[in-house]
Design a protein with these regions (language model features):
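C-terminal extracytoplasmic interaction modules
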Residues: 1, 56, 68-75, 83, ...
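Polar/acidic, low-complexity leader/linker segments enriched in S/T/G and N/D
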Residues: 1-94
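Short, T/G/N/S-enriched strand-turn elements that build extracellular solenoid repeat scaffolds
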Residues: 546-560, 576-586, 627, 727-732
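Glycine-centric low-complexity/flexibility signal
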Residues: 571-576, 595-724, 734-740
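Short, conserved beta-turn/loop elements at beta-strand boundaries and strand-helix junctions
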Residues: 174-183, 249-255, 259-263, 509-516
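The right-handed parallel beta-helix/beta-solenoid scaffold, focusing on the short coil/turn
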Residues: 149, 217, 235, 243, ...
Length: 740
């Protein structure tokens, strides 16, 4: 039976009221600072300057009899007060905006509670907490708001340790009580970028201490001390939303080194007018800009959620362009993110399982990406929906913003424009579909970036992408992930001859149900356009097996020549199965960066008249290549031996387990119990564990399958075959032998 546990983290003070402990001293005095002791929350704190919070985790589940829970083997308290849990999956919008947030809505039954776990001073209270109030009403009263608190949804099977359950990470967006119910709505962390929560730049608190004329060369800020508190040593400020000035600063005095800067005019200003700091990005990679906007201007964003190295690799080496902007007034972070997603060509989403913000460039799906067809798609669930509103035949981009204080969508506020037209698209559809973009991010001298933007949008949306909706069986090997590219095949997808074709697509919404995965995807056909060439970088950002690097290269680039530099990058979360470097001309400089995993295939378990299969090799090469392993390289695990008590080897009471790898090995059949299939990280268990006829376990990555009395497991696979050809930039985590 599937079990769902909800966890909330409440900021809970480590100190004890009026006491000195190893955690520190609370200076509160009962009867002076408060009439009763606190509840160790900020709202009830009598000495806020000393508030020292750590997360207190509260856990909840649906009523389920005598079910007990553990975390890392230790019993934990889980309150059985959940009435319902509903999940609305996220929707990503490739190359357009950040899409819609994933939402978890939990309805709780409010109930009396003893205040155990949430009150350090139960013995000092002059009332019985169980007889006074209810749990959630008291929780709400003791905290200023639950909004922004960490929220986790754990899903597993009954009896699973909480640490082994799949955990989805969110933040609370709202909480409310009505009658005997209490409702919490949590969303993915991009809700923190909402316009009501995050602005960049932040509003400045400095104002003019005295008026200035249009020719004055300095100004003084008020209140005293605000200069050191909020303003850097140099930069730009916008005065009263009318004039931008460059400055250097000493204390509260700004020396105005350029009046009427950034396309504005010098003007006189009155005492008390706001002096707003301008946020400036000059020739920065989009990955750097987005990281800064999120980490420094979006309260609650944890820098650990951002893999800056992977982001930089993605945009610097695939997009290869820099961007600039002056943001002269507080602007919604979500607005800035949406502009960059569209104008750079990005896909951006929250990975709720890995707790990572994912950033990818808008690019074609590999011809070797996972194929979903009739064997994986549940019958009658496939639908293809036309989306004519997404078609583009012309892109007009205005760039080189004149004045950051003027309207963003005013044509006269831009120095340059470029229009890119696909005349065949206009002819095919007998009408134009014009897309206008007003970019603060593309400087007037950066025409190549504007040209690339136009070509990229035409490439992606020249033909309106269809929406594909379908359900996949829960038992499939290639589990889909949000944002991943794949290929889909259905009788309704045909070419002009009526032949069924496999169309490329990208997962835009993923809902996990008990027996299926419900997928929404967007067709990802790219029509070749000019201005899209970059350095030769090949990304592997979806799971693939049988990866030949030369084949992948030749699918997107022309024939390689000697002395070319070519990089392959396995993205975080992606698996490259059975990597073969392939044949290349002499002196090509090859590098593969593994941020995800490179795995050999798992061996199948021993069966009747069938030997167990050895694990496969993860990386094979006979050509020089450099490897920067930031993830995992692992040979496949060997299949386990079957289990039987008969020297005649019949019957086979228990099947052996499949080896770890990609794809994982299959378990074998047994009369009493089958062996389990392997996974990408662990070998499957043999059947009938703990009996005399138990099947052998499949091997972990690079490990042999387990032998039994009469059954024989197979050898583990090699991590690398061709080690002498490799220049190891970083060895990283390796499972299995390195040979030759």
């Amino acid at each position: 039976m599937t079990v769902t546990v909800i966890e909330l983290d409440i900021p809970f003070c480590d100190l004890r009221y009026g006491e000195t402990t190893t955690e520190g001293t609370c200076p509160a005095v009962l009867g002076v600072d408060s009439e009763r002791k606190c509840f160790n929350t900020i709202r009830t704190c009598a000495a806020r300057a000393s508030f020292t919070p750590s997360p207190l985790t509260l856990r909840f589940c649906m009523p389920a009899g005598d079910v007990e829970f553990t975390r890392n083997g230790q019993p934990v308290v889980v309150i059985p007060s959940i009435k319902s849990v509903n999940v609305t999956p996220a929707i990503i919008n490739p190359g357009v905006d950040i899409g819609n947030r994933e939402t978890v809505r939990v309805v709780f039954e409010d109930h009396p509670h003893s205040d155990a776990m949430v009150d350090k001073y139960l013995a000092d209270r002059d009332y019985d907490p169980y007889q006074r109030g209810t749990f959630f009403a008291k929780l709400r009263a003791r905290n200023p708001s639950l909004e922004g608190y960490a929220f986790r949804m754990l899903v597993g099977d009954e009896g699973d340790d909480l640490a082994d359950m799949t955990t989805y990470h969110y933040v609370i967006d709202s909480a409310s009580g009505q009658g005997e119910q209490f409702t919490i709505a949590a969303k993915d962390v991009l809700i923190l970028a909402d316009k009501k929560k995050a602005q960049a730049p932040r509003i400045s608190n400095g104002v003019l201490a005295a008026g200035i004329s249009e020719v004055d060369g300095s100004l003084t800020l008020s209140p005293a001390g605000i200069g050191n508190a909020e303003y850097p040593a140099s930069g730009k400020v916008a005065i009263a939303g009318k004039e931008i000035c460059s400055f250097t600063r000493s204390g509260d005095v700004l020396t105005l080194t350029q009046r009427g800067d950034s396309g504005t005019e010098a003007d006189e200003h009155d005492e008390g007018e706001i002096v707003q700091l301008v946020l400036i990005y000059e020739s920065e990679a989009p990955s750097t800009i987005i990281n800064d906007i999120l980490v420094n201007y979006t309260p609650g964003v944890d820098p650990a959620w951002i893999n800056t190295a992977e982001w930089a690799t993605e945009v610097d080496e695939y997009i290869g362009r820099l961007y600039s902007a002056e943001i002269a007034e507080p602007t919604s972070v979500i607005e800035l993110l949406n502009e960059l997603i569209e104008q750079v060509g990005l896909v951006f989403w929250w990975d709720s399982i890995t707790k990572q913000l994912r950033l990818r460039s808008l690019r074609p799906v590999s011809a070797e990406a996972t194929l979903y067809g009739d064997d994986q798609i549940m019958a009658t669930t496939f639908r293809a929906t036309e989306q004519p509103g997404k078609r583009i035949s012309e892109v007009w981009t205005y760039y080189g913003q004149r004045n950051p204080l003027e309207g963003l969508d005013e044509v006269k506020n831009y120095r340059a424009a470029i229009a890119t037209v696909d005349p065949e698209a206009d002819q095919d559809y007998e009408q134009s579909a014009i897309k206008k973009i007003f970019s603060r991010w593309i400087a007037s001298n950066n025409r190549p970036a504007a040209s690339r933007l136009n070509s990229m949008l035409l490439s992606r949306y020249r033909d309106a992408p269809r929406k594909f909706s379908f359900s996949l069986y829960e038992t499939i090997d290639a589990v889909p992930t949000l944002g991943a590219g794949f290929r889909v095949e259905s009788w309704s997808l045909q070419d002009d001859t009526g032949a069924v074709v496999a169309e490329p697509a990208q997962v835009t919404s993923l809902e996990r149900k008990e027996d299926r995965y419900v997928i929404d995807a967007q067709e990802a056909i790219f029509v070749t356009q000019e201005d899209l060439e970059t350095s030769k970088v090949v990304f592997i950002d979806e799971n693939m097996s049988g990866v030949n690097l030369r084949t992948l290269h030749d699918q997107i680039y022309s024939t390689p020549e000697s002395y070319e530099v070519i990089r392959f990058i396995v993205s975080s979360g992606a698996i490259a199965g059975t990597v073969v470097v392939g044949d290349w001309p002499d002196f090509v400089d090859l590098t593969i960066v593994i941020n995800g995993q490179a795995l050999g295939r798992g061996g199948n378990a021993q069966g009747l008249l069938v030997n167990a299969q050895a694990g496969g090799t993860a990386i094979y090469t006979r050509y020089p290549i450099s490897i920067d392993n930031q993830g995992t390289i692992g040979g496949g695990g060997g299949g386990g031996g079957f289990g039987t008590t008969s020297s005649e080897l019949f019957p086979i009471e228990a099947g052996g387990g499949g080896g770890a790898g990609y794809p994982p090995g299959s378990g074998s059949s047994g009369v009493i119990e089958n062996g389990q299939n392997g996974t990408t990280t662990a070998g499957g268990l043999g059947g009938a564990q703990g009996t005399a006829y138990a099947g052998g376990n499949g091997g972990g990555l690079g490990q042999a399958g387990q032998n039994t009395t009469y059954g024989t497991g197979a050898a583990g696979g090699r991590a690398v075959d061709g080690d002498s050809y490799i220049n190891w930039i970083n060895l990283g985590t390796v499972h299995g032998a390195r040979v030759n």
